[in-house]
Amino acid sequence: DRMLEVEGGIFVAGTGFGKTVLALALINALKVPTLILVPSLTLIKQWVQRIQEHMGLLAEQIGVCAVTRDRLTGILDVASPRKLGKKEPKKLEASLSNYGLLIVDECHHAAAGSYVEILRSYAGKYLYGLTATPKRRDGKMPAVRMLIGNEIDKASVELVDYKVVKAVMSSSSKPLCPDAPYVLQVDDLVADMQRTQLVTSSVIDLVRRGRRILVLTERVEHMKILFKALQGSCDQFVMLTSDMKPKQRQAVLTKFAGISAG
C-alpha cells in the first residue's frame, strides 16, 4: 500500500521476503506498460517464470532483452541493463517511452554506467527500486537514491524460526601469518589439504544426519577442490561457479531446486 501512495522510491526487504511477488502485485495494481531491469540472466529467467506463474502469461507474451535476445513488447518486459544500455540514445529513449512503470531489481547496482543511461532516459510516471542491500561499500548509494528516489518502505523477514549458532573452528594445519597479504593467506588455505579434509568430512557427517549444507568460497579453484573431495560420498552435492556456461548453470540450478524441494 505504501508503494502505491508514492510514484517512486526504493523498497528494502530481506532475502526471502517476496519482493518479486510484491512487484507483480504492483504491476497488476497500476495497470500500465512495465519494464523490469534485472542484473543477471539467471534472475531474468526467474522473473519470467514468476510472471508466468502469477499473471497467467505465456513466455512469448513477455518481452526479454538480454544476451542474444532483443525483443521488447512495450507491455511487460524484462531486460538486462547491460544489453538495453547498448542501444543508441535515441533508440533507447524511443524504447523507454513505451513504459509508464520501471522497476529496478537489485537496485543497489544502479550506480553503474548502463543503469545511469537508462534511468536518465526514462520519463515515465512510476519508478521503483527493489533491494535487500541498501548500502554499497564504495559509498555510491546516494547516487542510486538520486536516480530512483529515497527509501519508501522497509520490511524484514525471519527465514528461520530458530536461533543461528555461529561456530568458528581453527581448521588450518599450519598457522597463518597475519602480516602476509590477504591473497597469500587465501592461497595457503586453498592448498592446505588437511583443512580440506576437515571441511569435507564435517559436511559429509552433517548431510548423513539429515542436514542441508551450503558451502561458500570466493575462489572457483577452491570450490572445485572441495567438490572433488565430496564426490562419491553423496549424489546430491552440486557445484555452482562463476565460470559455468549458461546451460551448465541452469542444469545445476534445476538439480538444486529438486534437492531443495525434496
Residue locations for each model-derived region?
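Conserved pre-motif I regulatory segment
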Residues: 1-12
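Conserved Walker A/P-loop ATP-binding site and its immediately adjacent core
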Residues: 15-53, 136, 218-223
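Conserved interdomain hinge at the start of the Helicase C-terminal
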Residues: 26-27, 176-229
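Loop/turn-to-beta-strand initiation segments
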Residues: 33, 73-76, 98-101, 123-129, ...
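Conserved helicase ATPase core of P-loop NTP-dependent helicases/translocases
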Residues: 45, 60-73, 89-91, 214-216, ...
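Conserved helix/coil segment N-terminal to the catalytic DExD/H
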Residues: 66-101, 112-117
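Post-DEXD/H (motif II) to motif III coupling segment of the RecA-like Helicase ATP-binding lobe
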Residues: 100-101, 106-166
